[in-house]
Structures are given as C-alpha cells and as structure tokens.
C-alpha cells in the first residue's frame, strides 16, 4: 500500500513539474504579435527566433474587426492559448512585406502598430518607474473602453500634473481589446527631456535627416546663398501658417481653447528639444558631452560613411550612419570631427593635468570654441512664434561680429607688415602666412557659426510644424470620439490637420530644393530620406482620413466639403511640385553665365533609379465613399477594411483622392526610390493604408498594349504570307539538265518527255505488271 501511494505521489509531482505554465510567454524568445498593412500579407512574430514572418497561408491581409484579429492570433499560434488582443503602445519597423500571389517580397520597411496576442489569463504589464516619476492608475467598473481611450485618459492625467506620460498599460479586460482601467507612469518634464532621444526617437529624426555636420562652408558667397535660401523658405512657411490660421477662424471656439493649454504645456519641452545648447551649461560642457557619446547608427538602414570622436583613443574613428536618428557625435569628415572634439578634449586634459597639450595639426577654430556672445544669445532663447525675427537678429549680430573681427585682423596685419620691412625675407613670409591662416580661420569659424545658426533655426521650424500637426491630429480624433459628434467641428479639425500635413510636406520639398541648388552632392545624399518622409506623410494622411468613415453620419454630412478640401490641396501641391521640378538649377557661385539645365539637357534625379520605392507608394487616395461604410453603432475609431473600393466591389466618389503626383512630373524626375515618428502618430493604427491604380498610368499602359498588339499582329501576318509563298515556290518546273554527250535522238526524246510524252513500250509493260 505504501509503495503504491509513494509511486502515485511521485507521478503527480512529475506531471506538475512538466506542465506548461499558465503564462504562455514563459520560455518564449518573443511575445506573440501580429501586424497588418493593407495590400500586403499579414505578419506575425516567430516566438522562437524573434523575427517577423508573413502569413503562413499566403492569403490573409488586413482584418477590420477585433474578433477577426483574435481569431487570426489563434490561427497563427495554435500551440498557445490566446485569450485576448491589445494594441501595442509603440510602433515597430517591419521589413519584407509580401503581396498576394507574389513570391518575391519587398525589402523596404513599413511602420505599423502591431497587436499583442495575450496568452492565458490576463496579467497587467510590469511598468518601470524611473527616479522622480510617479506610478498611477485609474479604474472604472462602469466603463468598458478601447486602448485608445485609456491612452488618452493617461495622457490627460499626466498633463494635468504638468508631467509627461512615460509608459502605460491596460487593466481589467472586459472584452476584445477593451478594458476598464489603465496603469501609467508620469515623469517630470525635465526628466522626459533628458530621455527625449529614446522616448521620441522618430520626432528627432525630422531634425536629423537634413541636419548634422553636412558641409564645410569655406566660401562666404556660398554661405550667403544658404542663408538667403533658408530665409525665403522659413518666410514662406510662416506666411502659409498665417493664411491657415485665417482659414480656420470660422471653426469652433473649442479648437482655440484646446490649443492654448497645449502650447503652454509643451513650450518648455519644445524649447529643450530644439535648441543645440542649454542656458545652464557652457559651450565647452555641451561639446564635451557630445564628443563623449558613443557612435549610434540609428533606426534607419542606410550605409553612410561618417566619423565620431572616440574618447578612449583620443581621436576620430569611422562608422556607418543609418541616415536618421543617432546622436550629435556624427561628422562628415575626420578633419571636422577633430576640429570640434580635438581642441575641447585637449583643453580638458590641460585643465586636469596642468601640462600643455598639443592641439594637433588642425588649426581651424570651431563653433564650440568661438566667442559665444553672438550665437549663444539666440541658441539659449527658447523658440516661439517670433522665431524668424529672432533668427534675423542673431544673423545680423553674427555678421557684425565677424566684420569687426576681420577689421581687427586686417589692422594687425598692416601694422605687422610695417614692422617687418627691415626683417629678412623668410620672416616676412612667415608673417604673411600667419595672418593668412588667421583670416582663413575666422572665415571658417564664421561659416561654422552660420551653419549652426541655420540648423538650429530649421530644427525649431520643424518642431513647430510637428507640434501643430500633433495638436491638430489629437483635436481631430477627439472631435470624432465626441458623443454626439458635431460634423462642423469635425470638419474644422480635419481641415486644420490636413493643412498641417501639407505645410510639413511643403517645408520638406522647399528645403530639399534649396539644398539641391546650393549643394547637389548633399541633395543626392538626403534624397532617399526626403522621399521616405513624403511617403510617411501620405500614408499618415490616408490613415487619418479613414478614421472619418468609421462615423458614417458625420462622413455623409461633410463628404462634399471634404472632397473640395482635398481637391484644393491636391491642385496646390501639384503646382508647388511642378514649379520645383520643372527647371531645376544648380548654383555655381557668382557665375551668372551658366546655361539652364534645359539647354544643357542635364537632369537632377530626386531618387536613384534602382531605389526601393515605387510610384504606387506615393499615390494616396480617398479610401471609399460614404455609402460603402459599414454601420458602426458605437462611436469608436477602430481599424476597418481599408482595401480600395474596386477590390471590394464598392463605388467610390469621383474626385475624392488625396494629393497625387502627376505622371508627367514623375517622368521628369525618377521617383522609384527611411521614418520619422512622433507621439501624435501613435493614436491611430498604421495598417490603414490604401492603394489605387493611377489613372494616367493606366492610360499609358493601355496605349502601350495596343501598340504592342498591332506590332505583334503585323509580324504574324507577314510571317504567314512568307510561309505560304515559300510553299508555292517549292514546286520546281525548271529545265532538266541533259548530258551534252548524248545523241541528238536522245536529246529529242528528253525534250518530248518534258512535254508529257510517255514511251508506249514502258507504258505497256507497266499495265501488264498491274
């Protein structure tokens, strides 16, 4: 009896030890997730190797319902007990998306917000609480809302406490992707600004992909071209902003009331994120901090050769920059890297050791080592609505300081030449060389300061555009979620959001045009990033517009006005793009006799021919008409079936497409070629992207097919005629060659046989044999 009981207990203990834990993620390398991008096959995370893989059946694309998403999770992870799904907090970059019925998958990435497949019993996320941050939570047992609702609650709660939302997670599930509470971590603004590179990496990308230590401007005339170009660009942007503000004055007063507290709450963060130095640190400390950072490739996957300062070796070393993100320890050349970091590190060693340290062969003064009175006053002033005026004053102060210093050097040079009249010839040459190097140093220093000024100004303008777009998107989504929604208010919010996106696109295009005029080589380096940025704007506008059609009543009432707004924006964008690329010109300094590019038949390509992007990626369209929207009784913004109407057997209203790029314009610049992301983009699902065939492209394809068909038919007819003619000519009726040695009788007999004569004797014997 006792041995049997012991054996039973041992068997039970062994079975429990081998039992799979209730937490299905235990022992898995990655969390079960799925990602969707309309027009492409769904992707799912391989929990064994941590890589994204396409749909195993090769047929499943984006799913419009939460029930369908849960079912799909259960299909791709049959060995796991999937009980619920929840939208992820942050977007991810996924490559190698596949299309239906195509074996080859494209390698360029898409940025999507995946869905997490929850395994077993629901367990809340373990949130990390940094120093000086607070952990909070809210639960309401009478409310059952989506992930987006609770994210908004957490963000507003942190804003009321003058803090930023650091991280959050859902609590108490009550349905598929619906919950009764949220847990979150709020951090002070200063703490968030210290971690801004990691928390808002995509937002920083917008300041990086055209910035950085781009070009060593040693020519003063070229610097002036850059400054004039940037002045005109920013002036145009500010004029458009003023016009847009007038256009939206007819909107609801709620919009203005919501905008004021947002600007007050984010003013401090914006100023911290966009300035290249701070008011509490000296210039040397900032440069020392920059040069002490590790080389960072960034999230993008380009292979750009750059240099960074290695503190351990005390010299600059090469590395590959991805094209976006990263940090400021990133220089174009080794000389520029040593000019910035070498002198500062040498001064640091001099302070710590008390012994003089050689500055090395580089004699160029740097922006960091220059007198900070001219530039720092602008850099230390937070950006505001008067940014352009502050930039003009800073530039004037910089030029005045440069002229004064150059005048002082010239006076010293003249005095030295007078004193060197009686010196040997070698000493005179040494004096001249000394002052020539000093003048070159001042010119290089002024060029670096101008470049720093322009980069800071561009970053601030970009930050203002980002903030306005983010605010417009949040107000637009809030208006859609109102109960009941007000169509006029929704349209005004949508109008402001579309204008914000268009200003961002125009700002990007104008900046690239100025760079192309001043430095074509630099333009060639950043053109793929510019194209990626434009594609992201198109996709984001498509997704945001698709949210409108989840509220059919509102969409139907304002459909005509939305179509008119989009058509107006399309015409304006086409004009801007046509003016930009119709006759590109390259600046050659003071040479005013250079022929135009149309005369020399020179073309400047915006993107490489063998790039990764196609024309289809740049053709956003109005997703579908109001009459094709499925009924949505609950006023919630959820993902829907985002396929084009033609693929779903539905009608689409004409003239409702978003801004497209004309095929005639595309033929002039080859546009078949990485992602800036901000917090305003995380509130909607990236999978809602729509594709449609371009009408102009279809016409060209039809004409090409017709011409090809005619050519093929002609070739077939000619071939048949020649074959038939060959058959007719194969029968030979020529003269039979006769031996010349035969007798005249035999020759006569041969002629008779040719005319049909038959020998009676032969004929007789043939009849007898038959």
UniProtKB/Swiss-Prot annotation:
Please tell me where Cu(2+) 1 binds in this chain: 147, 151, 168
- Name assigned to this protein: Amyloid-beta precursor protein
> What does the record say about its membrane topology?
Single-pass type I membrane protein
Q: Where is this region: Interaction with PSEN1?
A: 695-722
Q: Please, which domain of life does this record's source organism belong to? A: Eukaryota
Q: Which residues carry this modification: Sulfotyrosine?
A: 217, 336
Residue intervals of the E2 domain:
374-565
What the entry says about domains is: The transmembrane helix undergoes a conformation change and unravels partially when bound to PSEN1, facilitating cleavage by PSEN1.
Annotated BPTI/Kunitz inhibitor domain ranges read 291-341
Residue intervals passing through the bilayer: 702-722
Q: Where is this region: Interaction with G(o)-alpha?
A: 732-751
Q: Which additional comment does the entry carry?
A: Chelation of metal ions, notably copper, iron and zinc, can induce histidine-bridging between amyloid-beta molecules resulting in amyloid-beta-metal aggregates. Extracellular zinc-binding increases binding of heparin to APP and inhibits collagen-binding.
* Residues noted as binding Zn(2+) 2 in the record, renumbered to the chain: 677, 681, 684-685
């Amino acid at each position: 009896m006792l041995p049997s009981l012991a054996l039973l207990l041992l068997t039970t203990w062994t079975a429990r030890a081998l039992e799979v834990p209730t937490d299905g993620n235990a022992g898995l390398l990655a969390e079960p997730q799925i990602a969707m991008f309309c027009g492409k096959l769904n992707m799912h995370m391989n929990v064994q190797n941590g890589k994204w893989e396409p749909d195993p059946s090769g047929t499943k694309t984006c799913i419009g319902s939460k029930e369908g998403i849960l079912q799909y999770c259960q299909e791709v992870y049959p060995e796991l007990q999937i009980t619920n799904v929840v939208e992820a907090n942050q977007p991810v970059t996924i490559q190698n998306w596949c299309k239906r019925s195509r074996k080859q998958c494209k390698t360029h990435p898409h940025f999507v917000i995946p869905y997490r497949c929850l395994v077993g019993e629901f367990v809340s996320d373990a949130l990390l609480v940094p120093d000086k941050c607070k952990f909070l939570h809210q639960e309401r047992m009478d409310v059952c809302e989506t992930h987006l609702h609770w994210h908004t609650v957490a963000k507003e709660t942190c804003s009321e406490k003058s803090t930023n939302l650091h991280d959050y997670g859902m609590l108490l599930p009550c349905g598929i992707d619906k919950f009764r509470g949220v847990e979150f971590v709020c951090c002070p603004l200063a703490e968030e600004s210290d971690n801004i590179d990691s928390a808002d990496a995509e937002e920083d990308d917008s300041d990086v992909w055209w910035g950085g230590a781009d070009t060593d401007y040693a020519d003063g005339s070229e610097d002036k071209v850059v400054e004039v170009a940037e002045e005109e660009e920013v002036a145009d942007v500010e004029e458009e902003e003023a016009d847009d503000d007038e256009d939206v004055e007819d909107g609801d007063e709620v919009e203005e009331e919501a905008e004021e507290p947002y600007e007050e709450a984010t003013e401090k963060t914006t100023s911290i994120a966009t300035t290249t130095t701070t008011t509490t640190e000296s210039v040397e400390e900032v440069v020392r901090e920059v040069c002490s950072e590790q080389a960072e490739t960034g999230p993008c996957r380009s292979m750009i050769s750059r240099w960074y300062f290695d503190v351990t070796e005390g010299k600059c070393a090469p590395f590959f920059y991805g094209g976006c993100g990263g940090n400021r320890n990133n220089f174009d050349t080794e000389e520029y890297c040593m000019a910035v970091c070498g002198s500062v590190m040498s001064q640091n060693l001099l302070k710590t050791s008390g012994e003089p340290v050689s500055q090395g062969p580089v004699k160029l003064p740097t922006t960091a080592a220059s007198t900070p009175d001219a530039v720092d006053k602008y850099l230390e002033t937070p950006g505001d609505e008067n940014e352009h005026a502050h930039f003009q004053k800073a530039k004037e102060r910089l030029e005045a300081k440069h002229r004064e210093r150059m005048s002082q050097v010239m006076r010293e040079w003249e005095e030295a030449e007078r004193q060197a009249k009686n010196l040997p010839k070698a000493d005179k040459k040494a004096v001249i060389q000394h002052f020539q190097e000093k003048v070159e140093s001042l010119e290089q220093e002024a060029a670096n300061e101008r470049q720093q000024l322009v980069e800071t100004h561009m970053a601030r303008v970009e930050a203002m555009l980002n903030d306005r777009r983010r605010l417009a998107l949040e107000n637009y989504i809030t208006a859609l979620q109102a109960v009941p929604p007000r169509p006029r208010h929704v349209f005004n919010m949508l109008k402001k959001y579309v204008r914000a996106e268009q200003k961002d696109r125009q700002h990007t295009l104008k900046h690239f045009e100025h760079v192309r005029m001043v430095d074509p080589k630099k333009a060639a380096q950043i053109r793929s990033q510019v194209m990626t940025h434009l594609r992201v704007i198109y996709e984001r506008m498509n997704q945001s517009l698709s949210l409108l059609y989840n509220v059919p009543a509102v969409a139907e009432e304002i459909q005509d006005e939305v179509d008119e707004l989009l058509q107006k924006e399309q015409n304006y964008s086409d004009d801007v793009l046509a003016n930009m690329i119709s006759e590109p010109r390259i600046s050659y300094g003071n040479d005013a006799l250079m022929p135009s590019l149309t005369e020399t038949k020179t073309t400047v390509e915006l993107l490489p021919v063998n790039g990764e992007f196609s024309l289809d990626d740049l053709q956003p369209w109005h997703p579908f008409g109001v009459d094709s929207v499925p009924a949505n009784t609950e006023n919630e913004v959820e993902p829907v079936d985002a396929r084009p109407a033609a693929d779903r057997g539905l009608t689409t209203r004409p003239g409702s497409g978003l801004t497209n790029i004309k095929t005639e314009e595309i033929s002039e610049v080859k546009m078949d070629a990485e992602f800036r992301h901000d917090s305003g983009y995380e509130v909607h699902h990236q999978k809602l992207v729509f594709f449609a065939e371009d009408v102009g492209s279809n016409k060209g394809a039809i004409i090409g097919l017709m011409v090809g068909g005619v050519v093929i038919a002609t070739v077939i007819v000619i071939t048949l005629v020649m074959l038939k003619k060959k058959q007719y000519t194969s029968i030979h009726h020529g003269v039979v060659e006769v031996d010349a040695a035969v007798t005249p009788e035999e020759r006569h007999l041969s002629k008779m046989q040719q005319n049909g004569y038959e020998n009676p004797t032969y004929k007789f014997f043939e009849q007898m044999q038959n």
